[in-house]
Amino acid sequence: MEIEKTNRMNALFEFYAALLTDKQMNYIELYYADDYSLAEIAEEFDVSRQAVYDNIKRTEKILEDYEMKLHMYSDYVVRSEIFDAIMKKYPNDPYLQNKISILTTIDNRD
């Protein structure tokens, strides 16, 4: 499994998990976060390996579709980069430090 894809799926899952069914959440979490194999997930849920594979592929597409429409993850990445740039350029500015702190709390970055 590609590490970039795994990281992306885990990130998208963090943003959009609430929009998935319980089965989709379980399969994606076990496969990407817990590193279960398709066979292990199939055994756990008493379904075929092919059923797990199909569900995971469908769910990956759903997560990508949510991101394409809502941009929550990509917007978060941009905000994080802006926060980091401000903190680097103005490390001693208490006003900006305070505002960044508020925004990061809202953004759940901590």
Curated annotation (Swiss-Prot):
Q: Name one Pfam family in it.
A: UPF0122
Cross-referenced Gene3D superfamilies:
Winged helix-like DNA-binding domain superfamily/Winged helix DNA-binding domain
- Signal sequence span is none
- Which GO molecular function annotation, any one, does this entry have? GTPase regulator activity
| Classification via InterPro entries | RNA_pol_sigma_r3/r4-like, UPF0122, UPF0122_fam_protein, WH-like_DNA-bd_sf
Q: Report the family membership.
A: Belongs to the UPF0122 family.
Q: What does this protein do?
A: Might take part in the signal recognition particle (SRP) pathway. This is inferred from the conservation of its genetic proximity to ftsY/ffh. May be a regulatory protein.
What HAMAP family would the database entry show?
UPF0122 (MF_00245)
Q: What is this protein called?
A: UPF0122 protein SMU_1061
Q: Which organism is it from?
A: Streptococcus mutans serotype c (strain ATCC 700610 / UA159)
Organism phylogeny? Bacteria, Bacillati, Bacillota, Bacilli, Lactobacillales
